[in-house]
């Protein structure tokens, strides 16, 4: 597993995770600073939700790409990190533009530039659009799975305890990130999936969009 990551990649993933977790729970961090220790559970829930909604979304892209014979590495985006923190601070935690980094993909021939291993595939680029569709769909697909998982937990919760808080954060992040990324607009994931297979794209997009409309606009 370690051979699948470049030396800088793990620190980059941890930094992106921390920044997005801080942005997602910024208002509760302010509560902690002001002595409200009960807000710690919100920070922990945000960190777990970020791991499922953002980190696993990006790792979905990465490992499907590797499995298809490509080189894939996560790279932080400095301006994205700044924008994530600025929007969180400026809005007091009520609005967040979360874009701390992304997975970058290259042909396997580029492996020397990154210096780490990958699963080889003799079928690489047999159908570039098909490959691109599968890689692009992996992230929102993971968001959909976790959105359904957290929805079940949310509906089964009878009291507003830590589990319910985690389910709320998990729903917000997975539904928000997944539904946005499935919009058929370049360069989003949805554009690449819809371009190749509309029916397959709708199988992922419609449940995410439906949950977004219900939970965010209801």
Language model features: what each stretch is:
Residues 1-218:
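Hydrophobic transmembrane alpha-helices and their immediate loop junctions
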């Amino acid at each position: 597993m370690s051979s699948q990551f470049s030396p800088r990649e793990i620190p980059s993933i941890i930094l992106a995770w921390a920044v997005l977790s801080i942005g997602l729970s910024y208002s509760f961090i302010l509560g902690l600073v002001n002595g409200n220790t009960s807000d710690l559970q919100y920070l922990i829930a945000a960190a777990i939700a970020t791991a499922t909604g953002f980190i696993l979304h990006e790792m979905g892209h990465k490992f499907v790409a590797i499995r298809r014979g490509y080189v894939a590495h996560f790279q932080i985006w400095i301006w994205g990190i700044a924008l994530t923190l600025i929007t969180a601070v400026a809005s007091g935690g009520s609005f967040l533009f979360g874009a701390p980094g992304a997975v970058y993909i290259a042909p396997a021939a580029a492996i020397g530039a990154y210096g780490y291993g990958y699963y080889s595939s003799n079928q690489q680029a047999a159908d570039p659009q098909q490959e691109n569709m599968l890689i692009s769909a992996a992230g929102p697909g993971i968001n959909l799975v976790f959105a359904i998982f957290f929805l079940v937990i949310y509906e089964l919760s009878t009291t507003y305890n830590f589990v319910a808080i985690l389910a709320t954060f998990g729903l917000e992040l997975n539904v928000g990130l997944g539904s946005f990324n499935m919009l058929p607009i370049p360069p989003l994931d949805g554009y690449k999936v819809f371009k190749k297979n509309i029916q397959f794209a709708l199988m992922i997009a419609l449940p995410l969009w439906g949950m977004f409309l219900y939970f965010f606009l209801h």
